[in-house]
């Protein structure tokens, strides 16, 4: 298998994950900013790899598999770090909800693909808006430069949590008839 540039970008995103985790734990005043910058860079490759794969017609099965895995692992780890840092229920609850939703919907998509109905649970615009709010909130909550950005990040986290429920409901609703069949 020959790897193309979009797939290399996805692999690079996976490689960046331990670096933003390490930056998160560094005992320096600048560490949160470095952590957030690495996360922003990784999140940008999420958009850019898909854009290039479509533009250059270089979509591959491996890339189609790895891209969502890299995204979900990156976001789940960032949510765990944020929940650990704040150590309060009102951050942990939306973080846990978002992680649970990713597991549920990934399982649902896998099951729907097995029965030949993967398109019923294709990514929706709500999922894309949720991801944007989620990424924005995580950048601010990893960085924490001042109270205003932190507050805006909390708001974005809750917007992402609401969209998490909404999109999960939509996906489950789309698959409900198939889920209830014997």
From Swiss-Prot:
Membrane topology listed for this record: Multi-pass membrane protein
Question: What are the disulphide bonds in this sequence?
Answer: none
A cellular-component GO term for this protein: plasma membrane
Q: Which domain of life is it from?
A: Bacteria
E.C. number: 2.7.8.5
Keyword terms of this UniProt record: Cell inner membrane, Cell membrane, Lipid biosynthesis, Lipid metabolism, Membrane, Phospholipid biosynthesis, Phospholipid metabolism, Transferase, Transmembrane, Transmembrane helix
Q: Which residues cross the membrane?
A: 13-37, 61-81, 87-107, 146-168
One GO MF term attached to the UniProt entry: CDP-diacylglycerol-glycerol-3-phosphate 3-phosphatidyltransferase activity
| Entries under InterPro entries matching the protein | CDP-alcohol_PTase-I, CDP-OH_P_trans, CDP-OH_PTrfase_TM_dom, CDP_ALCOHOL_P_TRANSF_CS, PGP_synthase_bac, Phosphatidylglycerol_P_synth
GO biological process annotations for this chain's record? phosphatidylglycerol biosynthetic process
- Periplasmic-facing ranges: 38-60, 108-145
Q: Which reaction does it catalyse?
A: a CDP-1,2-diacyl-sn-glycerol + sn-glycerol 3-phosphate = a 1,2-diacyl-sn-glycero-3-phospho-(1'-sn-glycero-3'-phosphate) + CMP + H(+)
Indicate whether Cell inner membrane appears among the record's keywords.
Answer: yes
Regions of this protein lying in the Cytoplasmic compartment? 1-12, 82-86, 169-181
- Cell compartment(s), UniProt: Cell inner membrane
The pathway it acts in is: Phospholipid metabolism; phosphatidylglycerol biosynthesis; phosphatidylglycerol from CDP-diacylglycerol: step 1/2
Going by the record, the broad EC class of this enzyme is transferase
The UniProt entry's coiled-coil ranges are none
Tell me which family the UniProt entry assigns to this protein: Belongs to the CDP-alcohol phosphatidyltransferase class-I family.
Any idea what job this protein has?
Catalyzes the conversion of cytidine diphosphate diacylglycerol (CDP-DG) and glycerol 3-phosphate into phosphatidylglycerol. Essential for the synthesis of anionic phospholipids, thereby playing a role in balancing the ratio of zwitterionic and anionic phospholipids, which is thought to be important for normal membrane function.
What name does UniProt use for this protein? CDP-diacylglycerol--glycerol-3-phosphate 3-phosphatidyltransferase
What does UniProt list as this organism's lineage?
A: Bacteria, Pseudomonadati, Pseudomonadota, Gammaproteobacteria, Enterobacterales
Q: Which gene encodes it?
A: pgsA
């Amino acid at each position: 298998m020959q790897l193309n540039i979009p797939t290399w970008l996805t692999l690079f995103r996976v490689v960046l994950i331990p670096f933003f985790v390490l930056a998160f734990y560094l005992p320096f005043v600048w560490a949160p900013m470095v952590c957030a910058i690495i996360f922003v860079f990784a999140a940008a490759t999420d958009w850019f790899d898909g854009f290039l794969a479509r533009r250059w017609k270089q979509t591959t099965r491996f890339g189609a598999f790895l891209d969502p895995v890299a995204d979900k692992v990156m976001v789940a780890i960032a949510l765990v770090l944020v929940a650990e840092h704040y150590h309060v229920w009102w951050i942990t609850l939306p973080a846990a909800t978002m992680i649970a939703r990713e597991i549920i919907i990934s399982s649902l998509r896998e099951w729907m693909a097995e029965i030949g109905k993967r398109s019923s649970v294709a990514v929706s615009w709500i999922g894309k808006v949720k991801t944007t709010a989620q990424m924005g909130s995580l950048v601010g909550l990893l960085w924490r430069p001042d109270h205003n950005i932190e507050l805006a990040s909390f708001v974005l986290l809750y917007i992402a949590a609401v969209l998490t429920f909404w999109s999960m409901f939509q996906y489950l609703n789309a698959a409900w008839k198939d889920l209830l069949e014997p």
